Amino acid sequence: MTKPIVFSGAQPSGELTIGNYMGALRQWVNMQDDYHCIYCIVDQHAITVRQDAQKLRKATLDTLALYLACGIDPEKSTIFVQSHVPEHAQLGWALNCYTYFGELSRMTQFKDKSARYAENINAGLFDYPVLMAADILLYQTNLVPVGEDQKQHLELSRDIAQRFNALYGEIFKVPEPFIPKSGARVMSLLEPTKKMSKSDDNRNNVIGLLEDPKSVVKKIKRAVTDSDEPPVVRYDVQNKAGVSNLLDILSAVTGQSIPELEKQFEGKMYGHLKGEVADAVSGMLTELQERYHRFRNDEAFLQQVMKDGAEKASAHASRTLKAVYEAIGFVAKP
């Protein structure tokens, strides 16, 4: 039986965090045996905000090495860089003509980003969700692992696919969201009611996957908990957001359930919890970084992974693009 196709991607425009790892990358790794996984480094999305060219090139290779270090296996999955597969931009343009201005105007991420990058509100930033739809629909994707912040974009992808299919027949699979049961959201260390973000200006809120583990220990020990007396280590997102966040992180790293951890820390101080979280996270990062540096220092291997991945992706993408071009009436290239 053919495995369902999963597509997902991440920008190379900033260092990945443990939030990215626990909320996305680890799920990607776990899906490799049961699904046909296609994972993309979306460098074309990254340039919707200004990038330094040298830094972008470095960040792309860094991100690829991190994917591999986290356990994404090029023998099991297709891993590639978006700009290496021109069908993404080609389908993106075609889908622009089947997407309405009003739909894009309602995208909350555009509103947020245009406020943050007021000096550079470019058409690419506005049009970002259409390229994302092309990314997904090119591969006849069945499932897309999405966080809450991308659900609206996936809904638009589904709408575009259904609109196109209604006009031309079943050209696209209509993708479904895949939302993991747990580990999907790691919150900010000092503001635990908001999601941890690699673009956060306050670096004390964020744990980067490539950060010095000693620095991470200090950050975790400064993390917000609670002011109750005596302290109670209990999972309660509404009333104990900081404590709950630390329990979520510890559970994700160790594999222990939340009830097991609550029992383990019964009668203990918040300092005990922070110490355990710090030890677990720093240990995990030390091992991950050793693997990362091994891959990052072998640039010939990274180049081969990108080349092989782009060839596999393009073989799949070109079939979809050919069907789209034929449906809309383009003359086939001689």
Curated annotation (Swiss-Prot):
BP-aspect Gene Ontology terms: tryptophanyl-tRNA aminoacylation
InterPro entries with a match to the protein in the record: aa-tRNA-synth_I_CS, aa-tRNA-synth_Ic, Rossmann-like_a/b/a_fold, Trp-tRNA-ligase, Trp-tRNA-ligase_bac-type, Trp-tRNA_synthetase
Effect of P129S: In TRPS9969; reduced activity
Gene3D superfamilies the record matches: HUPs (3.40.50.620), Tyrosyl-Transfer RNA Synthetase (1.10.240.10)
A GO term from the CC aspect: cytosol
Residues holding ATP: Q11, P12, S13, G19, N20, G147, E148, D149, V186, K195, M196, S197, K198, S199
EC category: ligase
Effect on the protein of changing G329S: In TRPS4040; reduced activity
Cell location: Cytoplasm
Renumbered ranges of motif 'KMSKS' region: 195-199
GO molecular function: ATP binding; tryptophan-tRNA ligase activity
UniProt-annotated binding residues for L-tryptophan: D135
Keyword presence, Cell division: no
Record carries keyword Aminoacyl-tRNA synthetase: yes
Sequence motif 'HIGH' region, location on chain: 12-20
NCBIfam families xref list: trpS
Reported function: Catalyzes the attachment of tryptophan to tRNA(Trp). Amino acylates tRNA(Trp) with both L- and D-tryptophan, although D-tryptophan is a poor substrate.
Alphabetized HAMAP family for the sequence: Trp_tRNA_synth_B
Protein name as catalogued: Tryptophan--tRNA ligase
Organism of provenance: Escherichia coli (strain K12)
